[in-house]
A protein has these predicted regions:
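Short beta-strand elements
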Residues: 43-55, 163-194, 316-319, 406-414
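Acidic low-complexity segments
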Residues: 6-10, 16-29, 74-165, 199-241, ...
Length: 484
């Protein structure tokens, strides 16, 4: 994989301050069964190269799917031309930044390779789909299976070489029930494929996908006759498949350093977080410990090196409630330091494909487990709601004021779980919400989750992220139902 690219690339490198080649090849297969009928399979092979050139302070890049010598030569020339055009006109002197010079390999650990034929995969999905139709009020249901194999090569003019291979699996299942003019849906892991992980067939067993159809359908039917979630100030216990969204929107996006520096302000927005907050800001209660951890082998966004070549390592983003680090990669950290801000970042510069430039992204952003069991958290609540599975979200362009909804809730009264409620929602402000964190679940309440659909950037990039979290209890939260 490396020999032909490396030799050709190094022959063509111009006399510049920095030049890199990043090759990406993805092979994916998406299979789906809807209402027991297989849908057309979608298979794709996508490959190409991104060239980056830094010279005399300018920064340029160019991508091509033509990986021949002439294609590489043309891409290098275009990237060099953009570097010349941006020299002295950019937000920073890029030649002043020291880029990583990595060397290494990484491969997703796979315990059980997926050896099933396409027919066998469809049969598995049809069996799970058939289990969903437990009542005539079930009007729509589907099961799907998405696998991706990715190969990457990163080479620089100064001798860096990194090879990485990843295997991703995304199982999904959803059910919709309808009666008396109302529809309610339940999904396995959420609408955005929360049980996605790296690995092989072991993910299916680990996620609990087999046998999930009947339970998911039963819960959709229960929601049809459930009362609306009550409104008012009360305690909330969020399970991991909602914590995933809470972490993503009100910790992950606000802490992306390029957003803090203003790069996204006219598109995806800014952040309520400012550079002077790092090291002192009380982001959450002392129970809040958030880590960036691309080293967790089976989590969705694990890797050994980011797309600028920075080595992956676990780091605390928030420790005992105090904001410590930003989600910023090599270049953004250097830009912040050039402005006089001595912030620390992580190895999180990533792109979604060969035809996009790397930018600051979430990777695996996790809440560390605490000491409380789920039973202890429930027992501590006088009045509240336990909520599962994200359904909807709305958050302002500084990632501060938010309103989130879940698929299903369960009342808690006097320390006991009560009946199911539908349309549970809550609202808050990121800058203060995490200070209401009152209990953090132990490892028995933790789920390792993620999503393939985190969007950001111009042109748009949709990337994989991971979120592992225990169940968490928050006090005095503004809760409301669909009529609230």
């Amino acid at each position: 994989m490396t020999a032909s690219f490396e030799s050709t690339f190094k022959r063509l490198i111009p006399a510049v301050d920095f030049c890199s080649l990043r090759f990406v090849e993805e092979t994916s297969e998406q299979l789906s069964v809807r209402q027991n009928i297989p849908e057309p399979p979608h298979t794709c092979i996508d490959r190409g190269v991104m060239i980056t050139v830094i010279d005399k302070g300018g920064y340029g890049y160019a991508a091509t799917s033509d990986i021949s010598e002439s294609g590489l030569r043309a891409a290098i020339a275009r990237a060099h031309e953009w570097a010349k055009l941006t020299a002295g006109r950019g937000v920073a002197d890029y030649s002043a930044f020291a880029m990583p010079t990595p060397s290494g390999r990484y491969r997703t650990p796979v315990q059980q390779p997926i050896l099933l034929s396409m027919r066998e995969k469809f049969e598995m999905l049809k069996a799970e789909s058939a289990d969903c139709k437990i009542d005539d009020r079930i009007i729509d249901w589907s099961a799907s299976f998405w696998t991706t194999h990715t190969r990457q090569l990163y080479v620089t003019a100064d001798g860096a070489t990194v090879e990485q291979e990843f295997d991703y699996l995304v199982p999904s299942l959803s059910v919709t029930a309808f009666a008396n003019g109302e529809a309610q849906s339940r999904s396995f892991g959420g609408r955005y494929n929360g049980f996605c992980q790296q690995g092989g067939a072991e993910i299916i067993a680990r996620s609990g996908f087999h046998g999930a159809g009947k339970q998911t359908a039963a819960e959709a039917l229960t929601l049809l006759t459930a009362p609306n979630c009550p409104s008012g100030k009360m305690d909330v216990i969020l399970m991991p498949d909602q914590m995933m969204l809470q972490i993503h929107e009100s910790i992950g996006h606000p802490l992306e350093l390029d957003r803090i520096l203003g790069d996204e302000r006219h598109f995806a927005g800014t952040s309520f977080v400012t550079l002077d907050m790092f090291g002192s800001y009380q982001y959450g209660s002392p129970l809040l410990n958030v880590t960036f951890d691309p080293t967790m082998a089976h989590q969705f966004a694990s890797f050994a090196f980011d797309d600028d070549g920075a080595a992956a390592k676990k780091a605390f983003i928030i420790e005992n409630g105090i904001l410590k680090r930003t989600l910023g990669g090599t270049i953004s950290q250097a830009r912040a330091r050039a402005q006089g801000a001595m912030v620390e970042g992580v190895s999180t510069t990533r792109s979604c494909s060969w035809n996009r430039a790397p930018i600051d992204r979430m990777s695996n952003l996790n809440i560390e487990p605490g000491t409380s069991s789920l039973e202890e958290m429930i027992g501590s609540v006088e009045k509240g709601v336990l909520m599962r599975t994200n359904l909807s979200w709305s958050i302002d362009d500084s990632r501060n004021k938010f309103q989130f909804g879940c698929e299903i809730g369960q009342l808690i009264e006097n320390g006991k779980l009560g009946h199911i409620v539908k349309n549970p929602n809550y609202r808050g402000i990121s800058a203060t919400f995490w200070r209401s964190l009152a209990m953090v679940g132990n490892v028995s309440t933790q789920e390792v989750m993620g999503t393939p659909f985190c969007g950001k950037g111009e042109p748009s990039q949709v990337i994989r992220v991971g979120h592992a979290s225990p169940a968490c209890k928050f006090s005095d939260i503004d809760v409301f139902g669909a009529e609230g």
